[in-house]
Amino acid sequence: MGPLMLDVQGCELDAEEREILRHPTVGGVILFGRNYHDRSQLSALVKTIRQAANKPLLIAVDHEGGRVQRFRNGFSRIPPMGILHKARNQATDLATECGWLMAAELLAHDIDLSFAPVLDLERGSNVIGDRSFSSDPEQVIQLASAFIDGMHQAGMKATGKHFPGHGSVRADSHLESPRDNRSWEEIEATDLVPFRELIPAGKLDAIMPAHVIYTELDDQPAGFSRFWLQEVLRGKYGFNGIIFSDDLTMEGAAVAGGYPERAQAALNAGCDMLLACNNRAGAVAILDGLQNPPASRAESLLSTNNGDWSRLTSTSRWKNTQNRVQIFTEEFVN
């Protein structure tokens, strides 16, 4: 499997995209809202992508719930994780049900992965906000662990993001290069706690680092940093799963240079799969510029659950879970 995950422009593939998908460096496709019209169209698009690639291909989407849910009409509405605590003593069970429902519905369309859950603490970052479970690390651990259990029950792997924590910076890494000036001691006592606890518990199959520079510790964003990915994540915390880069076309990645330089820097730091989204020229530059890229280990994230929507929606679990999640969402989401 190649180490580059890229996007496609619309609800159908064009000729250039079919050719790009056959490139040996391409190992995945990330889908967005613009790729979705309805469920039957989505299933047809996914089938066409897999046929065009003619090789194992990881298909992913950001489908966390709340404001980050790419497919809406026809899919269950997943609430933002930041309001699950309102279910009080039922919050943990509700988190499991949300994780299962989200994953099961995507798998029923042959989509392998949702980049979830968010493990960032809610500490004033607008770009994170209610995407976070809580400002309290222990509550994040409890609810994220339950959400992941639901994903795993459905047959989907979990991706924790954004390591080592994006919640304490206000800048949006899509638009600029955020800087976090805190010490190691403060970061380890707060933002790193969910990662530190969930990794040895075997909950996290993949991790996505932040395009944030932690100035007291390294001059590179975490996704380009051997300190963060090799010394801390692999070494200190013993993480053996897949590391995704965040989108290499984001402004927060520009410090590493042009697109091929960004891709090589991420690979050198220890990323297994690179994301290049919303910039066809940038993705093509990476394909042309990467010299003999290593094969990705991300094939382990492919789903073995060949789902079927009609079969899924006829089960009592889907009916009961969908009903409970929708009642909660309608009560607490405007």
From Swiss-Prot:
It catalyses: Hydrolysis of terminal non-reducing N-acetyl-D-hexosamine residues in N-acetyl-beta-D-hexosaminides. Its EC number is 3.2.1.52. Pfam families: Glyco_hydro_3. It comes from the Bacteria. It is an enzyme of class 3 (hydrolase). GO terms for biological process: carbohydrate metabolic process; cell division; cell wall organization; peptidoglycan biosynthetic process; peptidoglycan turnover; regulation of cell shape. The keyword ATP-binding does not apply. The active site is at 174 (proton donor/acceptor), 246 (nucleophile). One of its GO terms (cellular component) is cytoplasm. Belongs to the glycosyl hydrolase 3 family. NagZ subfamily. Plays a role in peptidoglycan recycling by cleaving the terminal beta-1,4-linked N-acetylglucosamine (GlcNAc) from peptide-linked peptidoglycan fragments, giving rise to free GlcNAc, anhydro-N-acetylmuramic acid and anhydro-N-acetylmuramic acid-linked peptides. This is Beta-hexosaminidase. It comes from Tolumonas auensis (strain DSM 9187 / NBRC 110442 / TA 4).
